């Protein structure tokens, strides 16, 4: 059985790491390079680095921060935010990213997923999906940092991007984001069971059992968290030891 990954997430705006609740109420969590270095030393399997206002503000990619982080960190780095074209993928890979995540731009132009995967390989293309539960009980895709409803069904969109060559899906529950109530396990399992590519569960981790549940009940291949690591509640090493004790295969 493949080992399951723990991925701390750095949401960045204006050059600082921040954390909010349900995509709003952002609170400063520190310097991205320092935080990335800390997670590397704690044994994180990967880091995800999202410029959360690049698309909604129409700003350019923050390449200098990515270069700084990549020069300090020797674990795989996924970078997203403001990716609008295949050329942006190249610029991020050249700056030191190992994988590039796209979200709003993939919804606006699904060919971007196919073209980027064909050119650079599926292994470095991640599609991030921000999902919100509707009153009907299914999940809708939102874009532009969770501000724009698309009317698209999350499970169908996940199947579409996997078919187009996305090597991985980063699935965030907007309802659970920052809530510390645990992953939306029904959402995570619905997407994980519908696609053959790895799914990263995101949104809602408040304790170490939530990480285990994301794998065992949500069928995710990796679990992503921010608050529990940024503010020192747990280290990545503690999370891995807990998961291993619960029978989840992790790299210690």
Swiss-Prot record:
It holds the Pfam family His_biosynth. Its main location: cytoplasm. Its EC number is 4.3.2.10. GO terms for molecular function: imidazoleglycerol-phosphate synthase activity; lyase activity. Keywords: Amino-acid biosynthesis, Cytoplasm, Histidine biosynthesis, Lyase. InterPro entries: Aldolase_TIM, His_biosynth, HisF, IGPS_HisA/HisF, RibuloseP-bd_barrel. The active site is at residues 11, 130. NCBIfam families: hisF. This is Imidazole glycerol phosphate synthase subunit HisF.
């Amino acid at each position: 059985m493949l080992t399951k990954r723990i991925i701390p997430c750095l949401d960045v705006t204006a050059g600082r790491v921040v954390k909010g609740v349900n995509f709003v109420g952002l609170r400063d969590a520190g310097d991205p390079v320092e935080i990335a270095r800390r997670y590397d030393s704690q044994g994180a399997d990967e880091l995800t680095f999202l410029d959360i206002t690049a698309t909604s503000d129409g700003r350019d990619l923050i390449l200098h921060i990515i270069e700084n982080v990549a020069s300090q960190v020797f674990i795989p780095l996924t970078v997203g935010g403001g990716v609008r074209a295949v050329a942006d993928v190249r610029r991020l890979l050249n700056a030191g990213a190992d994988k590039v995540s796209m979200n709003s731009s993939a919804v606006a132009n699904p060919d971007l997923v196919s073209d980027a995967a064909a050119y650079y390989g599926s292994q470095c293309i991640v599609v991030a999906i921000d999902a919100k539960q509707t009153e009907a009980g299914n999940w809708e895709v939102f874009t532009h940092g969770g501000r724009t409803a698309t009317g698209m069904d999350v499970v169908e969109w996940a199947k579409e991007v996997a078919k187009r060559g996305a090597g991985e899906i980063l699935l965030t529950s907007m309802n659970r984001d920052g809530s510390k109530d645990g992953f939306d396990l029904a959402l995570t399992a619905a997407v994980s069971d519908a696609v053959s590519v790895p799914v990263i569960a995101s949104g809602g981790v408040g304790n170490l059992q939530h990480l285990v549940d994301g794998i065992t009940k949500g069928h995710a291949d990796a679990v992503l968290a921010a608050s529990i690591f940024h503010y020192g509640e747990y280290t990545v090493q503690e999370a891995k030891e807990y998961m291993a004790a619960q029978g989840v295969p992790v790299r210690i």
